[in-house]
């Protein structure tokens, strides 16, 4: 691997560790030319399916968009970042487990709702109200009744 400081090809790994989740490796490297140290991370390259929108348009799966959609209903809710990160990983794992080349946006929304329901009921209701286009109070009451 090239040194990010001097561009030399002569670097060596001086330490490797697997992260807590077991899905990536952290490597400390040293450049033999300039003697500077740097860290790299190795993860598996996963090909996520394309998302098929309700209008039939297809777009690449976007983790940042997923994070934004997931965290918006959690705004001002007492949910630790670790829970959010874990839930987002669960969502990605569920998508990958399907083994499909495409996923319907509505199916992705249902998976997001399941994860929100598991970590924060208020966020779940907030998301459901937008995702399912609630029209009146009865729609909210139906979802709240289903929580019990």
Curated annotation (Swiss-Prot):
Which domain of life does the UniProt lineage start with?
Bacteria
Q: May I ask which residue range the UniProt record assigns to the signal sequence? A: none
Q: What range(s) does the ATP-cone domain occupy? A: 49-139
Q: Which InterPro entries match?
A: ATP-cone_dom, NrdR-like_N, RNR_NrdR-like
Which sequence ranges does the entry mark as zinc finger (unnamed)? 3-34
* UniProt keyword list: ATP-binding, DNA-binding, Metal-binding, Nucleotide-binding, Repressor, Transcription, Transcription regulation, Zinc, Zinc-finger
Q: Which cofactor does it need?
A: Zn(2+)
- So what does this one do? Negatively regulates transcription of bacterial ribonucleotide reductase nrd genes and operons by binding to NrdR-boxes.
Stated name of the protein: Transcriptional repressor NrdR
Name the species this protein comes from. Answer: Methylobacillus flagellatus (strain ATCC 51484 / DSM 6875 / VKM B-1610 / KT)
Read off the lineage from the record: Bacteria, Pseudomonadati, Pseudomonadota, Betaproteobacteria, Nitrosomonadales
């Amino acid at each position: 691997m090239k040194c990010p400081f001097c561009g030399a090809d002569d670097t060596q790994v001086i330490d490797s560790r697997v992260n807590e989740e077991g899905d990536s490796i952290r490597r400390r490297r040293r450049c033999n030319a300039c003697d500077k140290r740097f860290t790299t991370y190795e993860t598996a390259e996963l090909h996520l399916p394309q998302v098929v929108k309700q209008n039939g348009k297809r777009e690449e799966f976007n983790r940042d968009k997923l994070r934004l959609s997931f965290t918006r209903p959690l705004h001002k809710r007492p949910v630790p970042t670790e829970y959010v990160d874990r839930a987002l990983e669960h969502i990605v794992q569920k998508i990958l487990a399907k083994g499909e080349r495409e996923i319907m946006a509505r199916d992705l929304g249902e998976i997001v709702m399941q994860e929100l329901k598991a970590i924060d009921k208020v966020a779940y209701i907030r998301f459901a109200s937008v995702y399912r286009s609630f029209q009146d109070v009865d729609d909210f009451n139906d979802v709240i009744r289903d929580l019990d």
